[in-house]
Amino acid sequence: MALPNKPLGELKAVRDPEVEEREVDILIVGGGMACCGTAFEVKKWMDEGQSVLLCDKAAMERSGAVAQGLSAINTYIGDNAPEDYVRMVRNDLMGIVREDLIFDLGCHVDDSVHLFEEWGLPVWKKTEDGKNLDGKKGQTMGTLKGGAQPVRTGKWQIMINGESYKRIVAEAAKLAIGEENVLERVFIVELLLDANKENQIAGAVGFSVRENKVFIIKCKSMMVACGGAVNIYQPRSVGE
């Protein structure tokens, strides 16, 4: 459950904040699309008795780049070939790519889009006479998985009503691992290494952005996806 946006009263920094220690098998750092997907998938592979915790410095329903809402999904292969998608990405990124990873994405990305639609994401559809139906009306045409044709804005993009895109995916993540295993408003600032094993992750330290509290979380495995990757390259428009 998300804490209120505004703390009740002024939070004063003190020398000795409350310290809470936790220990889990799997720690997921971040609350954007990547970590929501991780939370949904990891539950399928966890053994009975294993524990997981997701830490987000904001509230999952409105955190990350997708929280602003989107009008399109940039990659839906559909009737196209994954090999063509690899060629497009390779050209777009000036050859600095892992073609095997791109090909795998092209082979499986449609399954993720089908899941989003099953969870409630409205996708625009084409009618048999070529008319465009927006998300709500498009539902009358059936699902993409069932063979309905999406409305495209290019070769790879499909149109959606994505105002609540992130809320839909965050809800699926919370249902998968349980809300009690989601820690919101906690900013992870330091990763911890095992004292006895070189380069072995052992945990993380963070602080609450709403309470005067520090968290020390021990773990055996960690997934870190805190965004910002879109800033690795400048836009193509600058001619880099």
Roles of regions detected by a PLM:
Residues 28, 33, 205-207, 217, ...:
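Mobile, glycine-rich extracellular loop/lid and propeptide segments
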Residues 20-24, 211-221:
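Core beta-strand elements of the Rossmann-like FAD/NAD(P) dinucleotide-binding domain
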Residues 24-54:
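N-terminal Rossmann-like FAD-binding beta1-loop-alpha1 element of flavoenzymes
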Residues 221-240:
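Glycine-rich loop(s) and the adjacent beta-strand/alpha-helix scaffold that form part
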Residues 37, 63-64, 215-217, 232-234:
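Short helix/loop capping segments that flank catalytic or ligand/cofactor-binding pockets
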Residues 2-8, 15-18, 23, 50-51, ...:
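Conserved N-terminal/central alpha/beta ligand/cofactor-binding core
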Residues 44-48, 73-77, 238-240:
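A glycine- and small-aliphatic-rich helix-loop capping segment at beta-alpha/alpha-beta transitions
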